Amino acid sequence: MSVALFCGPPPAVSFGCKDGRGRKGMVRSKDIVRQTVKPPAHACRLIGWNKYPGSVVPTNSSLSPSPTALDDEIELDLSPFLIIYKDGRIERLKGTTVIPACPEVATKDVIIDPATGVSVRLYLPNVVDLPSKKLPVLVYFHGGGFVIENTGSPNYHNYLTLLAAKSGLLIVSVNYRLAPEHPIPASFDDCMAGFNWVVSHSAGPAPEPWLARHGDLTQILISGDSAGGTVTHYVLLRADAGVIEGAALVHPYFLGSKRLENQTEEDFEFHEKLWRLSTPDTEGLDDPLINPLAPGAPSLAGLKCKRAVVFVAELDFLVERGRMYYDALVKSGWGGEAELVHQKGVGHVFHLSDYSGDVSVDMMAKMVAFLRGE
């Protein structure tokens, strides 16, 4: 097990989505990973949407492009997330850096499904003083639009290290497969598998000693931000009754076919394009996987938890969808306790890159209080 010290937030990066300006002013991350994996056929068909400025690099048919020029031809541009080139490369522009598992709390990675490569990263707070104490368990699903990020991303690793230290919970972060190489529902299936893997430790031999020795499996909570919030809802509908104590949905990535007043046309079209790339068999933005309030979607009365909190941010493209979800949950006849936390002056997942600001500190305090049941 590798050991390191939690060093605070990563260097600030200018991402428009974090300050309410959409994608304006975006800069590319320096940590670019080029993957020589041919994307699925559906990803290439999306080039028909050539109404987005800059999404395709035109070529001169009268010239024979050099290998270098061909390498740079773009099939589909989904900045600031990823770019797909005509030669099959996928270039992820952010969310690719991986830092080793490390404690201030103890951390380690465990592969839970060798066939798919799905793994989890565990965060165990200091239990030296109380070695026999059982800790509530939080299963966490990271965000990234289903196409970027991982459990080793600096933002997520640092945030969950801090959350484990402050809350005293044993955290299990699920590293699911990403689209477009692994189209949805792969990510949903992987997260459900990660959740079930944790639950399995309550019945019979436990393969993971940290969970067996230190996890209170009568106190399981789940949470996720952005796309991870979408997955959290998915798991809540499919878990066995009585297993999940509470759920925290942070800036959940819920969409819909109707553009809301706070959503620009540019952002709306971008996220529709991203969803169709990730989910080739989708019927659109009213797919119940991404729109829990769509006609035919399962009733929110069926959520399998006792308590739920929904965090929304004033400058977030998704703020109204989050509020609508909360309102629908309250009116659904669901028998649990629901809470809405609306934070002003901040944008989407601001808390992952700013730990010291007043709003971030307040959000952490509210999250810790919820997880502890205070």
From Swiss-Prot:
EC number, as in UniProt: 4.2.99.22
Gene Ontology molecular functions: hydrolase activity; lyase activity
Tissue specificity remark: Highly expressed in pistil and bulb scales. Lower expression in stem, and barely detected in root, leaf, petal and stamen.
Keyword presence, Plastid: yes
Main EC class the enzyme belongs to: lyase
Annotated TM spans: none
Annotated GO biological process: defense response
Main location as per UniProt: plastid
Active site: 226, 316, 348
GO CC annotation: amyloplast
Catalytic activity: 6-tuliposide A = tulipalin A + D-glucose
Additional free-text comment from the UniProt record: 6-tuliposide A and tuliposide A-converting enzyme, which are compartmentalized in the vacuoles and plastids respectively, come into contact with each other for the enzyme reaction releasing toxic tulipalin A upon cell disruption by pathogen infection or herbivore predation.
Family: Belongs to the AB hydrolase superfamily.
General function of this protein: Lactone-forming carboxylesterases, specifically catalyzing intramolecular transesterification, but not hydrolysis. Involved in the biosynthesis of tulipalins, defensive chemicals that show antimicrobial activities against a broad range of strains of bacteria and fungi. Substrates are 6-tuliposide A > 6-tuliposide B.
Subunit structure: Homodimer.
Protein name per its UniProtKB record: Tuliposide A-converting enzyme b2, amyloplastic
Organism (species): Tulipa gesneriana (Garden tulip)
Native organism taxonomy: Eukaryota, Viridiplantae, Streptophyta, Embryophyta, Tracheophyta
This protein's encoding gene: TCEA-B2
